[in-house]
Design a protein with these regions (language model features):
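Anionic-ligand binding patches
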Residues: 2-9, 15-220
Length: 220
């Protein structure tokens, strides 16, 4: 695989993802620039898979910055919800987003909106749990996180890697670590949620860490 060089764009505006990805890349000694630092726009995610969207974001950032760019597309897939929210995990946290195929009452049109009108994962977790409850006790609480990681170069070359971690959902959410749906997810073999375990422990087992290990192995 091609080398990255001394600088890399991390194609995300999510501060939690940016921090975690910088920590995972630290051993490589590469200067990591966030998309916001370069004033790069967030492209519309039009793909139908996690890899589709991660490649779209990586290519867009590489084209605009002239630097190699690394993008992540990740999400929570719940068995009882037939894989939802999946690639729309972030959208479930957006103000006014109507959950497709919702079985429970969806609330007011502005549900999910906080005072700043930004993504609210507290309410997104409530949405997920309501849907799981509406699916019935027999549906269970099994779920998994998926991370697709794509590295793109300005010449159009792109390499992608995927990681998954399986577990169960709990309610109410627990812990202040992590971000997104972490406080309601317990990985197999653990008693604490991703919101409770130490960041170093999460980095050892998470879907993102698995994808990063594949990336680092490919870089040699």
């Amino acid at each position: 695989m091609k080398s990255i060089g001394p600088k890399l764009v991390i194609a995300t505006h999510n501060e939690g993802k940016l921090r975690e990805m910088r920590e995972l890349l630290a051993p490589l000694g590469i200067e990591c620039l966030g998309a916001a630092e370069l004033d790069l726009p967030e492209p519309e995610e039009t793909g139908v898979t996690f890899v589709d969207n991660s490649e779209l974001k990586a290519r867009a950032s590489a084209d605009l910055s002239g630097l190699p760019a690394l993008a992540d597309d990740s999400g929570l897939s719940v068995d009882a919800l037939h894989g939802r929210p999946g690639i729309r995990s972030a959208r479930w946290a957006e103000p006014g987003y109507k959950v497709p195929g919702a079985q429970s009452a969806s609330g007011s049109p502005a549900e999910g909106e906080d005072e700043a009108g930004t993504r609210d994962f507290g309410r997104a977790m409530e949405r997920v749990w309501r849907e799981v409850e509406a699916a019935g006790a027999d549906a269970g609480h099994d779920a998994h996180f998926t991370c697709a990681l794509s590295l793109a170069w300005p010449d159009g070359t792109v390499e992608s890697f995927e990681g998954k971690v399986h577990g169960t959902l709990v309610w109410p959410p627990r812990g202040q670590n992590g971000f997104g749906y972490d406080p309601m997810f317990v990985a197999l073999g653990f008693d604490e949620t991703f919101g409770e375990i130490e960041p170093s422990a999460k980095r050892a087992i998470s879907h993102r860490a698995q994808a990063f290990r594949k990336l680092v192995a490919a870089l040699g």
